[in-house]
Structures are given as structure tokens and as C-alpha cells.
Swiss-Prot record:
It catalyses: (3R)-hydroxybutanoate dimer + H2O = 2 (R)-3-hydroxybutanoate + H(+). It comes from Albidiferax ferrireducens (strain ATCC BAA-621 / DSM 15236 / T118). Pathway: Lipid metabolism; butanoate metabolism. Its main location: secreted. Participates in the degradation of poly-3-hydroxybutyrate (PHB). It works downstream of poly(3-hydroxybutyrate) depolymerase, hydrolyzing D(-)-3-hydroxybutyrate oligomers of various length (3HB-oligomers) into 3HB-monomers. Its EC number is 3.1.1.22. This is D-(-)-3-hydroxybutyrate oligomer hydrolase. GO terms for molecular function: hydroxybutyrate-dimer hydrolase activity. The active site is at S309 (charge relay system). It comes from the Bacteria.
Length: 704
């Protein structure tokens, strides 16, 4: 059973008047610490879930439903908010985790595995109340979605809050399967935010947008309540549609806000929202009989900043920026974090030494976007995500050679040169297996999104000749060209989109393809050659390395997202897979650990855990080519959260920095063996000498 209420947390005009009058009392009254809604928060909507028909963690699907087929929508053109929420939780949970039994779902992790790791027979549904609001500056241009889930097991006598900032560019449910699940199982309130990304899809042809409850509306009707509306006048939009019909603006790419610079701020605001909700629920009434007092504060509440990927980077940023003592400790996995250049730091693994803090995200993504299609030809990966076409990849190799970026006479030599260039740039040799698949599904989408957001480009800028559109089927009258989007796909986009096209039926288009705009991967370069759009790739790279006006804009935005690695002595754990190909350890976890030691010195309480045979996308571990080679990093995320909670609750020591050596599942015939505890040994309290990660004299030494 679900109940909803949009008014129970509003401070009405009457309440405000009562508070004002009570404040006029005599000077002998003791000042009360009243709970006040933060000024940046809009109207708060709430819904309660009974944990039987619906719940906080699985939207009523339970462990079985999350592992099954996508939930049906009765009317695809007009889905209900409840249906969209269920779709969002289903898709976001599965986007983070491997939901195959052989990979550990239902045994190592999952709704039926309790907070102590005990496997149960229940569906793992969690009762409680969910609160949602926008954070905004009054313009409606930000509209950061904030959400707090309070499980029925929350104990105000032993309170805890866990942050769950969305990973990737996902919406507010993006971390439901990572820190969200851990927090709910442990009886903590969970503070979510989409951090200014999420499902903000503006259909420019039809002028429709997403709104907070998941539905779609005309941009005019939505007004300031839109998740995102492109900053175009009606005249500008009409001109854009005439020149480039059937296109879309996407919030993370086109909000012109560079939200990443404020990911720490939004995460801290989500904690403040959680405190407001909890004190409204558990705080005693003030003497006026209307307001509530602050019962829960940072002095008596454990707050763990957490999440994975971009959400993990947001947690680290929040801890760096925390001036109110809101955060007690940090436990994150595979963080997207970018550091100011600092040549004092060196990182050594075996015979390889890298000097400095690593490349910034757009630097290494635009480099990968150039090299990966060619390197794919020698990538050992044979998994289902390797969709690189050998002939087109060969043409990319030729184009790279012509531009002086690789060497070699034959295609094989050129491909080997491209792979060697990636390793020389900082990717670990263990990533070579995954370079092909990452180009197939991740590299260009991320590079294009971040080039746009860092430069604060609008959709009408068509940066580097790229745009977003639905494209026709290969057998249609307009094969692979922009076409009107499916109304049903757009109607359910809140529940299906990951915030970065290609998603929800929206693809990446090369506007400059010879003969007219086409799906980028199939587009034609000068001379009618298919080479994965070398001109577009070179243009994106030039935004990082060049001096053009557009490059200056992008580089300014890049400078705004740099972090300090100063956690102010907070206890912290970072876990990351050595084979991470999306966010390589040489650019993220390793240098963050080293710079934290440099800037904090003896005050540093950060431990860094690097896991062999683990990479960025656990959700892909159920597929051939991934399943037999790699293990779930999520197993170590859970352990890191447990260790951090024990440290904050009882003072238990955090583990020393170390390499955890896992054992791939391998094959039994053509299928991967079921995972066992032997494949994923635990983090040790004290690392063996051969597994230590150490810091001394500004040098991080990582066990090989």
C-alpha cells in the first residue's frame, strides 16, 4: 500500500506567522533550535510504502522481479508515475549490478541478502517513506532533484544517513543498487540527488520535457517545474528545428550550467534535506506547537558520503567542501575525480612510473575516442559489447596514421601502435581486454557529453557537428538518418534513460556526414569513407589540446571541476578495479590517494583498495567475455561500507591500503563457472607485504 502527501512538509504562511509571533516573546525565553526547511528546497512530495505491495528498494518487484523482465506499462503513451518509478528503479538497479545467479546475485548481494551478508528467502522489500523535492536558485534552470528515503527500521536513537548521489548521468534513482541499498538495509536514511544530470530530455521538435514525477509535458505547461528546458527562445527553437529537425537537448550536455563543479554542493544539500526530513518526522514539537525541534544533528548522527563512479566523485567533493561537519566518513567505489596538476606526486607499479596527478576526464576520453576503434582490432575481448566493425576500424587506423598519431605500415601494426599508445598514456595493461567494448558503448557518448557541459554549449551550437536524434532503421525509407522519436519511448524515458545518449531511443548523429546527417557510427567522412567520423573525433580532441575559442571555453570548464584531495582528516575508503577502463586507476584512485597523503600528511585517514580482475561495469559481468574474466567490484564496495560504518560506530580500525587478488571464474565448457567466495577474498585488515600500497616521499608504490 502506498500513500502520498505533497503538503505535510510545507511551512505554510500560517506556520511562518506563528513562528514570527512566538519569536516576539520576552527575552527570558530559551531559544529553541527549530527545524527549518532550507531555502533552496521547493515543494516536498512524499509517499509511504508498506514493503509488501510496494517498497523503497525494489518498487514492489522484490529480488525476483529485479532479476526478471522489465515491468510492464499498461498504457505506454501515458504511463503512471508509479509505473515510471518502478521502471526507473528496475533499470537503475540492473545498470549497477550483475543480476545473474552465477555472478553472485542472491548469494553475495541482492535484496534477499541482509546487512550481515546472510542469504534469506525473502524478496528483500523495505518499507518506509520517500520524499522528493527540487533544489533550485529560483530560476528553474537548476532543478536538481533531491530525494530522501527513510526506512521503517530507521532508529532515531542510533541515527545514520548515507548519501547516494547518482552515478554516471543518471537520474535520482541512479544509486539505488549501490549506496542506496546498503543504507536501507542498515536502517539508515538515504540522501539521493541527480546532481544536475538525470533524465532531462527536451524534444525540440514537439517542445516537450520531463517533469519531476516522471511524466512529460509541454515546455510551456511545465514552466519552471521542468527537469530541463533548453535555453532557446521560440524563434530560436523554430530556426533550429528548420535547420536540424527531430533533435533533442539533453540536460547534462546542454544545461549550460557545468553541474559537475557543484556536485559536492548538491551532495551536501541532499544531507541537509535528509536532516530536515528526519527532524520533521522525529523532532519534538517546539513550544509554539507547530514547528519541530532539531533532534538529529551532526553531533549525534553518523553520515557516510558514498556512491560509485560519478556519485563517488561527488561524495569526495562533498567531503572536501564540508565546512559544517555534515559528513562523518567516506566510502566510495571507482570514483570519477579530477585533480589539479601537481608534479610532486609519482606513482610506481612494477617498472612503470607515472609522474603527476593523471589526466583529466575529457583529456583521456577524447584520446580514447581517437585510438580505441583502431586498437580494438588487437583487443583480446570477444564479448557481446565489442561491436566495432573491422573494416571501419581499419579505416580509422589509416586516418590516425595520416594524422601522425600512430605508426605502422599494415593495419595490424597500426592497431598495435594504437593499443601501445593507450597503455603509455596510463591505461593499465589489464584494460586491453576491454578497450574494444568500451568504444562500442561508452567512449564517444561520454566525450561528447562532457565537451558540451564543460564548454557550456547549448544544443544549437551543434558542437563538432554532433547532435542527438532518433534514427531510422537500416531497412526504413530513411536508413540511419534523423527521424521523429517514438512517442511511447519518450513517454517512458524517465524510467529507461541513463542521461547520456544513446539512450531512450535517442542516438548520436553526425550532422556533417557526406550526403546528410547520419547515425555517427555509420556516417561518411570526406570521400565517402566510413572511419567512425575521424573529423568529429579530432574536433573533440582539439577542445582539450587546442587554443580555439571553443577550446578555451572547454578548458575553463575543466578547470572548474578540479578537486583538492583534502578530506580534512575524515576517515575514507576508496575501492577500485585495476582493470577499470572507463576511469583508469592511474587517473583517479591512485593519484587521489597520493595527493591526499601529500596535502593532509599525518592527518590522512584514507585507505585505497585496488582489486584485481575488477572493472567499472559490474552489470556486464553476466555476459560472455566478461563473466569468465572478471569479478564484481560491488562485493568490495559492500565490505568498504561495512568497514566504514564499524569505524564510525565502534572505532574499529580501517584496513591498510592494499591490492586484493581475486580469482577469475573461468569457464566450464562455454559457460562461466558460478562465483564462489574463493573468487572474491575479503579485504584484509592488514595487507600482506606483497600486496601493500604504500606512500613515502611523495611516491605511491602499488604492488604489482
Amino acid at each position: 500500500m502506498t500513500t502520498t502527501n505533497r503538503n505535510n512538509l510545507k511551512l505554510t504562511a500560517l506556520t511562518a506567522a506563528v513562528l514570527t509571533l512566538s519569536a516576539c516573546g520576552g527575552s527570558d525565553a530559551v531559544a529553541e533550535n527549530k527545524n527549518v526547511k532550507p531555502a533552496y528546497l521547493g515543494e516536498v512530495a512524499s509517499a509511504s510504502y508498506d514493503g509488501i505491495s510496494d517498497d523503497l528498494l525494489t518498487a514492489g518487484l522484490g529480488k525476483t522481479g529485479l532479476g526478471g523482465a522489465a515491468p510492464a506499462v499498461v498504457d505506454p503513451l501515458s504511463p503512471t508515475s508509479a509505473e515510471l518509478r518502478k521502471l526507473a528503479i528496475f533499470n537503475n538497479y540492473r545498470a549497477i549490478l550483475d543480476i545473474t545467479a552465477g555472478g553472485g546475485y542472491g548469494t553475495l548481494y541482492g535484496p534477499n541478502v541482509d546487512a550481515k551478508g546472510v542469504v534469506g528467502a525473502s524478496e528483500g522489500m523495505i518499507a518506509g517513506t520517500e520524499y522528493i523535492a527540487y533544489s533550485d536558485d529560483g530560476t528553474g534552470r537548476q532543478n536538481i532533484t533531491m530525494m530522501v528515503q527513510v526506512p521503517a527500521t530507521f532508529n532515531p536513537a542510533s541515527p545514520c544517513i548515507v548519501t547516494a548521489t547518482s552515478s554516471g548521468s543518471r537520474g535520482v534513482y541512479g544509486a539505488i543498487g549501490s549506496s542506496g541499498e546498503w543504507g536501507l538495509k542498515n536502517g539508515c536514511a538515504v540522501a539521493y540527488t541527480d546532481k544536475g544530470t538525470g533524465t532531462g530530455i527536451h524534444d525540440l521538435q514537439n517542445d516537450t520535457v520531463n517533469v519531476q514525477n516522471g511524466g512529460r509535458a509541454s515546455a510551456t505547461a511545465a514552466g519552471k517545474a521542468s527537469i530541463f528546458t533548453a535555453l532557446l527562445t521560440s524563434i530560436e527553437r523554430a530556426a533550429f528545428n528548420l535547420a536540424t529537425p527531430n533533435r533533442f537537448a539533453i540536460k547534462h550536455a546542454h544545461s549550460q550550467q557545468n553541474p559537475e563543479k557543484d556536485w559536492g554542493k548538491w551532495t551536501l544539500q541532499s544531507v541537509e534535506f535528509a536532516y530536515f526530513v528526519l527532524n520533521q518526522k522525529y523532532g519534538d514539537l517546539a513550544s509554539d506547537g507547530v514547528a519541530h525541534l532539531k533532534k538529529l544533528t551532526p553531533a549525534n548522527t553518523i553520515v557516510i558520503a558514498s556512491s560509485v563512479s560519478n556519485g563517488a566523485g561527488a561524495a569526495l567533493a562533498a567531503a572536501e567542501q564540508d565546512t559544517q561537519g555534515l559528513i562523518s566518513g567516506v566510502a566510495v567505489a571507482e570514483p570519477e575525480v579530477q585533480l589539479a596538476p601537481d608534479a610532486r606526486l609519482s606513482i610506481v607499479r612494477g617498472t612503470t612510473t607515472l609522474v603527476g596527478t593523471g589526466k583529466q576526464l575529457l583529456d583521456y576520453f577524447t584520446l580514447a575516442n581517437l585510438l580505441q576503434p583502431c586498437a580494438a582490432l588487437v583487443s583480446p575481448s570477444t564479448n557481446v559489447f565489442n561491436t566495432v566493425n573491422a573494416a571501419i576500424a581499419g579505416n580509422r587506423c589509416s586516418a590516425l596514421k595520416a594524422n601522425g598519431l600512430i605508426t605502422g605500415t599494415t593495419t595490424a601494426e597500426q592497431a598495435a601502435s594504437a593499443m601501445a599508445a593507450l597503455v603509455a598514456a596510463g591505461w593499465q595493461p589489464e584494460s586491453s581486454d576491454l578497450q574494444a567494448s568500451h568504444y562500442s558503448f561508452a567512449t564517444l557518448p561520454v566525450a561528447l557529453t562532457y565537451a558540451n557541459t564543460y564548454g557550456r554549449f547549448g544544443v544549437a551550437d551543434n558542437l563538432c557537428g554532433f547532435s542527438y536524434a532518433a534514427t531510422g532503421a537500416a531497412t526504413s525509407a530513411t536508413p540511419l538518418a534523423p527521424v521523429p522519436a517514438s512517442a511511447a519511448v519518450l513517454a517512458t524515458s524517465f524510467g529507461t534513460s541513463n542521461g547520456v545518449p544513446p539512450t531512450a531511443g535517442i542516438n548520436i548523429v553526425n550532422n556533417n556526414s557526406v550526403g546528410g546527417p547520419l547515425l555517427d557510427a555509420a556516417s561518411l567522412s570526406v570521400g565517402g569513407v566510413q572511419d567512425y567520423n575521424i573529423a568529429g573525433a579530432l574536433c573533440l580532441r582539439g577542445l582539450v589540446t587546442g587554443t580555439s575559442a571553443n577550446a578555451v571555453r572547454v578548458q575553463q570548464g575543466m578547470s572548474e571541476v578540479l578537486r583538492s584531495a583534502n578530506l580534512h582528516g575524515k576517515p575514507a575508503l576508496i575501492v577500485q578495479g585495476r582493470s577499470d577502463t572507463l576511469l583508469p586507476v592511474a587517473f583517479t584512485g591512485r593519484p587521489y590517494f597520493g595527493m591526499n597523503k601529500i596535502v593532509e600528511g599525518a592527518n590522512s585517514r584514507l585507505s585505497y583498495i585496488e582489486v584485481t580482475n575488477a572493472q567499472h561495469f559490474d552489470a556486464f559481468l553476466g555476459f560472455p567475455g566478461y563473466a569468465n574474466r572478471l569479478v564484481p567490484l560491488h562485493r568490495y564496495f559492500i565490505q568498504a561500507m561495512d568497514m566504514m560504518y564499524a569505524n564510525l560506530k565502534t572505532g574499529a580500525a580501517l584496513p591498510t591500503s592494499q591490492v586484493v587478488r581475486t580469482v577469475p571464474r573461468g569457464l566450464a565448457g562455454t559457460a562461466a563457472n558460478p562465483i564462489t567466495a574463493a573468487n572474491v577474498p575479503p579485504i584484509k585488515a592488514v595487507a600482506d607485504v606483497a600486496d601493500q600500497i604504500t606512500f613515502a616521499n611523495n611516491v605511491v608504490t602499488v604492488a604489482d
